[in-house]
Amino acid sequence: MSSREDVEDVETGERAEEQPFLTRETEGDGEASEAGATPSTSTRLNNPPAWSEKSRARRPHGLCKLSLFILLFLVTILGLSGLILSFPPKGTRNSDNDAHSHGDQEKTHQDDPNHGHTGDEKPSIVHYHEDIPGLPRLRDTSEYVLSPSWDRSSAPVTREYHWTIADGELNPDGVYRPMILINNQFPGPLVECNEGDTIIVQVENKAVNATSIHFHGLFQNGTNFMDGTVGVTQCPIAPNSNFTYEFVVQGQSGTYWYHAHHSAQASDGLLGPVVIHSKDELTLQELDYATDRVIMVQDHYHNTTAELLMGYLRPDGENDEPVPDNPLINGRGVRNCNDFKGWRCDSSNTSKPIFDLTAGQRHRLRFINAGAFAEFQIQIDEHPFYITEVDGTDVHPEPFHRLNILPAQRYSVIVDTNITTTDTYWLRARMVTHCFTTKNNRLQPEIRGIVRYISPNTKPLTSDPQSKEWSEAIEVQCRDLNTSALHPVQHMKPPPADDFVTLRSNFMIGDWRLARGFFNESTWHANATHPSLYRFLDAKPELSSLETPLAINDKAFDKEHDFVLQTKGIRTVDISINNFDDGAHPFHLHGHKFFLVAQGRSGYPPTAATLDKYLQEHSGILDNPLRRDTVTVEGYSWAIVRVVLDNPGLWTLHCHNTWHSESGMVMQLLVQSEVHGYHQERD
């Protein structure tokens, strides 16, 4: 087992009963009892701050607790009665209503391609259980190949997942290292659903450290408290505690992912893909395709992120980000154990990933950069492809043959298997090493997978592909993909901006300082026991109300460590992000998509007064600009995004370079703070 078991999380090792906003309660759901299910214990938010008029954070007094105890007692008695009565008489069959009992719904992706959708009548709840005993293992990522029989037009259902988070030792590339696993496997399971479905994820934390789960790119409209950001919307899930995430997927479709949002734990293994289908998916994707699959690329470290963070955040560290050891594709890589003397290593079960694609068809590949630091350049030898989706936004197809993708970004491409030179081709995923400021003698910057054409005459693979690399020079700069030609299929003209906000991102280094990242004059520190959301809800009205529609709240928050931009009403805001650092920053906004209005690699960015003129002079587009949730601002460059702040809650804007966000390059947007009835008298 991992040496993690001997380590204490000194920052957030509090148990649930010690945390003010995580409490345990027993679910005695009558429906579950009638279905023969045993009531389970889970941790939920106690009166979570549902962003509605009636919702506010409360803490029950003694009378409330007594009433709750009596209610739970009565529900338990009634539930037991229902359980006894639910057993059918001897020799009888279950009725149609019983056919979808709790036990019958416990299916895995492999058991049912439609994930529980069988017959004309759809179950109201689909359960996903994985019981993987024994040693930790690499996930069978065949589940990342999406089923062509998935019903995109089915009625909304509830999809309930059961995840056990635990520590374990695993060797994704041959080299063993401590990891954080979901259901004893790495990477995490695919979450696949339709727009309108309800997602429930029951998390049981058996790891030695606290954690959380963030569903990256999901709007969480009405469920801000399910955003999973430790220090902003929730306390971490303490060891030996449970927490249930529950939200409705609405107003979006496409490719997303989930990951830990506490410290740098995502790079320890706590991540996986999310695919949301729309009933209009085949219309929004203007090129048809025969198959559909997820391909996650990520940088991989053989040391734990706790060790790496200690070195990165040391005094006088000069912001030297930890350099990865090698890349992974869908959680797999290949290293030669002879290069790792003194390490526990076994590469006998490692192999290059193989993607079998039927010849003569189009195929959709959903690329996700799930890494901490490295930009990737991805190509398939001799195959151009069309980009058709960017961060969940369907776009008119545009041809490319190399894809630059930074951490947290997602792209769908359509590739046509119509090349006749051979049957096997390299899929190359290279880390752009120009971004690395230090040397790693064990660095392997490229990973290769094999794209294999399959047909009735396909023979076993006996040798590596001999395909040809693209001839032009490889980009060495850390630059975002040029997306100026990509325009959404669903045409949308951004509304005029109400406000203009200027942000400066930089690092304070030198003079034996800690390597801290800043937005303007603020460097963020996560408050694990008193998240920003709850501090705002508990603040007095004079500290949390606004006199103007938009302002920095420096009354309820210490702006030195909590840069909170607060709005009243729905506001459309231009945010000008100016990067004073030499490295690229992929900035991600929670809870929203933004319009990418302008970008520049030199000179001063336009101001509110000069933006329209700048767009006219530089052929800028404000008719139907790209909408996404993660934009890269290159070194000493700038970008202007326009965002409609109409999703009530507290949302982070941060660099998705893990090391930079952990150094403090985080700010928060407090949206529509006046509509929630916060300041009603508390019990």
Residue ranges of model-derived segments:
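Aromatic/His-enriched, Gly/Pro-containing loop or helix-boundary segments
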Residues: 182-192, 222-256, 261, 282-285, ...
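Extended terminal and domain-junction accessory segments
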Residues: 46-49, 53-152, 264, 268-311, ...
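Intrinsically disordered, low-complexity terminal tails of fungal membrane proteins
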Residues: 1-59
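Asparagine-centered strand-capping/turn motif at beta-strand->loop junctions
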Residues: 203-207, 367-371, 576-581
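N-terminal edge beta-strand
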Residues: 170-193, 342-356, 540-573
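A cross-kingdom feature marking solvent-exposed beta-strand/loop segments within repeated
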Residues: 226-243, 351, 386-416, 556-561, ...
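Short tyrosine-centred short linear motifs in exposed loops/low-complexity segments
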Residues: 194-197, 241, 248-255, 360-361, ...
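Acidic-aromatic/histidine active-site loop/patch
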Residues: 291-362, 368-371, 508, 517-518
